[in-house]
Amino acid sequence: MAKVDLMEYERALELFEPVLGFEVHVELNTKTKMFCGCANEFGSGANTNTCPTCLGLPGGLPHVNEKAIESSIRLGLALGCDIAESSRFARKNYFYPDLAKNFQTSQYDEPIAHDGRVSIELENGRELTIEIERAHMEEDAGKLTHIGGATGRIQGADHSLVDFNRGGVPLVEIVTKMIEGAETDAPEVGRTYVRAIRDIVKALGVSNARMEEGNVRCDANVSLRRRGSSELGTRTETKNVNSLRSIERAVRYEIQRQAAILEAGGAIVQETRHWHEDTGSTSAGRPKSDADDYRYFPEPDLVPVAPSREWIEELRGTLPEPPAARRKRLTAEWGFTALEFQDVANADLLDELEATIAAGAAPAAARKWWTGEIARVANAQGVAAGTLVAPEHVAELAGLVEAGTLTDRLARQVLEGVIAGEGRPQEVVDARGLAVVSDDGALVAAIDEALAAQPDVLAKIRDGKVQAAGAVIGAVMKAMKGQADAARVRELVLERASQ
């Protein structure tokens, strides 16, 4: 890829105002596809979840997935949108190898939801309201794998493989209105907005929201307006960016790239662009089409979607607490920093943590166990942390540590037993005999034996070299099989050595 000149970011912002727009594609986690009965599953063998309808074969007629309609309405409501009394599907006509029918069933001028808003808060405390123009339903395309060539893109590839398992999976595309005023925060605005959308769909349960699996993908639109001018610049659309960090980097890169071109007297081409994570850069894709180029027309095989007011209000009643409001409430209740809270949220452990704290655990202890040892075991086993252990058992375990019955080391062994199905934490402690030895008499006996075996260490301690006590403490902990409080052992070692 040819090297591209970039303008320093700060200089670019002195000369130009960035104008942003984002299109976030959310894959719905329905059991079946949008217009047929094929399974909606990630990771199945290539082209195993297909049928005449999603392959566009003659005679394959679509029928709408009611659950997808329900999820789309709930998502629209959570975004503060108005839900249309009637919305219509349309055919979006274009040719690409991953589109079996040579058209995509989408929505055009009659989307299911419109005119919403999402509030975000940046790291500097600045709050912005992002206006939502529309949220419309559509089907996903298949997945292409390009073989050969240097870029992994279709250009230059020897050949391409297409997997239509994803073709027909239900999507909601959320389109913002033009975002002005982001200024130097523009890259962070992109990252924070998409994270807010991801958090909303997670809370609703309408999507798995795993960006690494393509459940949430973002197209980032960037243009620059010269300071003092009212004329909007030509925009580019960086397609299918699938991580929060990449969204931030892609927006920043496009600002720097476009600023360098404009300041040199060049012109920005209205086009799609590809994001390259390895080089941290974008490259040209295809000329950006306008709506007329897609020759939209109403889908003749599907009737309009006309949800009743009663059903919409019923679905409104199922909405959970908004993630932003929950974040503020729990951060205040738990005393977490923004970073500590985000660690828990990113690990998808808010429900588990809240239940653990409600069961009596201190917030810091609950966070430590869920984001530490439990998360480690879950990652090793390839399962969700919440499936390993009940929140009330984590609270009980934390209570045993706080009471001094267990050290952290012993508590990890107890957790291992709980996960293995040996019972509640106290039952595992009793069965395995893992409680901390609290009898000072037994500890003193072990300490005296260790001091007698290491007279040189005893001499060093008496000479004021207290760090030498570590050897004795280690010997005592070994003799007690780790079932002693190291801090208490240290106190007793220094006490006995001074006699």
Curated annotation (Swiss-Prot):
Gene3D superfamilies on file: 1.10.10.410
Enzyme Commission number(s) from the entry: 6.3.5.-
Source species, domain of life: Bacteria
Pfam families membership: GatB_N, GatB_Yqey
Primary enzyme class: ligase
InterPro entries named among the record's database cross-references: Asn/Gln-tRNA_amidoTrfase_suB/E (IPR017959), Asn/Gln-tRNA_Trfase_suB/E_cat (IPR006075), Asn/Gln_amidotransferase (IPR018027), Asn/Gln_tRNA_amidoTrase-B-like (IPR003789), GatB (IPR004413), GatB_Yqey_C_2 (IPR023168), Gln_synth/guanido_kin_cat_dom (IPR014746)
GO biological process, one term: translation
Catalysed reactions listed for this entry: L-glutamyl-tRNA(Gln) + L-glutamine + ATP + H2O = L-glutaminyl-tRNA(Gln) + L-glutamate + ADP + phosphate + H(+); L-aspartyl-tRNA(Asn) + L-glutamine + ATP + H2O = L-asparaginyl-tRNA(Asn) + L-glutamate + ADP + phosphate + 2 H(+)
Coiled coil: none
Entry keyword set: ATP-binding, Ligase, Nucleotide-binding, Protein biosynthesis
GO molecular function, one term: glutaminyl-tRNA synthase (glutamine-hydrolyzing) activity
Homology family: Belongs to the GatB/GatE family. GatB subfamily.
Job description of the protein: Allows the formation of correctly charged Asn-tRNA(Asn) or Gln-tRNA(Gln) through the transamidation of misacylated Asp-tRNA(Asn) or Glu-tRNA(Gln) in organisms which lack either or both of asparaginyl-tRNA or glutaminyl-tRNA synthetases. The reaction takes place in the presence of glutamine and ATP through an activated phospho-Asp-tRNA(Asn) or phospho-Glu-tRNA(Gln).
Subunit structure: Heterotrimer of A, B and C subunits.
PANTHER family (UniProt xref): GLUTAMYL-TRNA GLN AMIDOTRANSFERASE SUBUNIT B MITOCHONDRIAL AND PROKARYOTIC PET112-RELATED (PTHR11659), GLUTAMYL-TRNA(GLN) AMIDOTRANSFERASE SUBUNIT B, MITOCHONDRIAL (PTHR11659:SF0)
Protein name: Aspartyl/glutamyl-tRNA(Asn/Gln) amidotransferase subunit B
Gene (name only): gatB
